[in-house]
């Protein structure tokens, strides 16, 4: 069976069809004597054994996805090992389907056991796709935003297809404003702002106090090294803390679409225009792979290894 001549074109076609790795596609065609449909089934049947082998590999690529359903929105992150797989329609459909289920599931544990259209749970569907695609895949995280009234704005940066991309943001504005279109437009603009400016909290009080104290200590030590008197140091530190807040607190940041105003001032102006109070209930910002250790790869060596196999 190993003597069968498998063309590069056939391997390429099978890879495009299934998203599986090149060597897996070649092996599938050899094992099935070049029968294309049987090769697809062969890849699917590899299942759990393949998934177990792939599970130890770093999955830091992939996609973030958003789904908004009325006054509920979710963001999920589904990881793959390579950007090539993230551009595959099969993987994109998987991420989109998981996001759709997340709106109903509301938490990641329930989401993992939720049933997909195939009848498999999300976890089982991911394992099946590991077998077919040939890379480690993972549902890494999800978050949900729910409001009682108002509008949810969403934005996806570096969008590859609608609602899927590298950075996904949701912003929930609570308000009883009658003009929903203007409220939704404001929520959308703030979502774009959050994507670009990466705030750490909505206001001062919700900012991690450990982070504030760490910054305060750094500023104090730096000012002390400059040989300033203690009373001057205290004023300098407070000034730097205020600047720090303006950089990381959403309401204090200069608004992306009108830097002369802070986000708080933009909201205040909108309240006057719409005749109703507007409050940012929550924002979610997912950036693909943040916090994951990336494995450095040499592409030339990787291709050479495949060629030698």
Curated annotation (Swiss-Prot):
Family: Belongs to the EF-Ts family.
Superkingdom in the source lineage: Bacteria
Protein name as it appears in the record: Elongation factor Ts
Species lineage: Bacteria, Pseudomonadati, Pseudomonadota, Alphaproteobacteria, Rickettsiales
Gene3D superfamilies: 1.10.286.20, DNA helicase RuvA subunit, C-terminal domain (1.10.8.10), Elongation factor Ts, dimerisation domain (3.30.479.20)
Main location: cytoplasm
Region of interest (Involved in Mg(2+) ion dislocation from EF-Tu), ranges: 82-85
InterPro entries named in the record: EF-Ts_dimer_sf, Transl_elong_EFTs/EF1B, Transl_elong_EFTs/EF1B_dimer, Transl_elong_Ts_CS, UBA-like_sf
Name of encoding gene: tsf
One Gene Ontology MF term: translation elongation factor activity
Keywords from the named record: Cytoplasm, Elongation factor, Protein biosynthesis
């Amino acid at each position: 069976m190993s003597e069968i001549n498998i063309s590069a074109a056939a391997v390429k076609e099978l890879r495009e069809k299934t998203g599986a790795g090149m060597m897996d596609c070649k092996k599938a065609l050899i094992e099935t004597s070049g029968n294309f449909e049987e090769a697809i089934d062969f890849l699917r049947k590899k299942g759990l054994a393949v998934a177990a082998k792939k599970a130890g590999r770093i999955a830091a690529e992939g996609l973030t996805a958003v789904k908004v359903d009325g006054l509920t929105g979710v963001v999920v992150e589904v990881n793959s090992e390579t950007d090539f797989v993230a551009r595959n329609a099969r993987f994109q459909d998987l991420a989109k389907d998981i996001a759709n289920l997340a709106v109903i599931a509301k938490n990641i544990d329930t989401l993992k056991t939720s049933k997909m259209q195939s009848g498999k749970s999300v976890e089982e569907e991911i394992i099946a796709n590991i077998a077919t695609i040939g890379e480690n895949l993972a549902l890494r995280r999800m978050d949900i935003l729910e409001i009682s009234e108002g509008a949810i704005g969403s934005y996806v940066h570096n969008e590859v297809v609608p609602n899927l991309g590298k950075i996904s943001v949701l912003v929930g504005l609570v308000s009883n404003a009658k003009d929903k279109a203007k409220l939704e437009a404001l929520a959308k603009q703030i979502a774009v702002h959050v994507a670009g400016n990466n705030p750490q909290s909505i206001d001062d009080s919700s900012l991690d106090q450990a982070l504030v104290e760490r910054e305060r200590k750094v500023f104090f030590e730096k000012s002390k090294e400059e040989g300033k008197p203690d009373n001057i140091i205290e004023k300098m530190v407070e000034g730097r803390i205020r600047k720090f807040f303006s950089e990381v607190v959403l309401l204090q940041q200069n608004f992306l679409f009108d830097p002369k105003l802070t986000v708080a001032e933009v909201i205040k102006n909108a309240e006057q225009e719409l005749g109703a109070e507007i409050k940012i209930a929550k924002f979610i910002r997912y950036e693909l792979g943040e916090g994951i250790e990336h494995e450095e790869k040499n592409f030339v060596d990787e291709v050479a290894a495949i060629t030698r196999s």
